[in-house]
Amino acid sequence: TKDAPSRERQAEIFKKVIAIAESLNLPLVIHSRDAEQPALDMVKHLDKVVFHCYSGTLPTMKEAQDSGYYISLATNVCRSGHHQILARNVSLDHLLVETDSPFLSPRKGRNEPANVLDSVRLIARIKGLEPQEVAAQTATNTKRIYNIR
């Protein structure tokens, strides 16, 4: 919620979640809709952060990337002009893709994991790249952030 007492409570809980991720040396995955900058300000001391389902501003996205953090774009990039602008501006080496299933479908109806290919194709077109290049780099990024061998 957006009222001050609720935001303060959310910040206190978020600090606890940050501490858990830090103590376990795990990436912190943040869904910070309408609070991207405050969330970023709270995690700048961390090494591994993913901004899940990012929908914030370009300056905050750039600041997150400059901190080495990942920006994850959901399949709504296929139908949202704002998300297409984000896709154009995110650096490929800081990009992750996701569906956020069953939500944010690229078309009418329930979303599903296979739809991530729609995002990859569109992001490739926006960036003037081949879909295979976007798929390969986002797979590499995913393995890197989650320490998958």
Question: What kind of region is each of these model predictions?
Answer:
Residues T1-K2, T99-P102, N115-V120:
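Active-site gating loops and adjacent loop-to-helix segments of metal-dependent hydrolytic enzymes
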Residues D93-E112:
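Short acidic/histidine-rich active-site segments
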Residues T1-S67, I85, P106-A114, L129, ...:
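Divalent metal-binding pocket/active-site signature
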Residues A19-I20, V116-R149:
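Mid-to-C-terminal alpha-helical segments outside catalytic/metal-binding sites
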Residues Y70-H83:
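Active-site glycine- and acidic-residue-rich loops that bind
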Residues S32, C53, T75-V77, S101:
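Active-site metal-binding loops of divalent metal-dependent hydrolases
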Residues H82-L92:
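Short amphipathic alpha-helices and their capping/turn segments at secondary-structure boundaries
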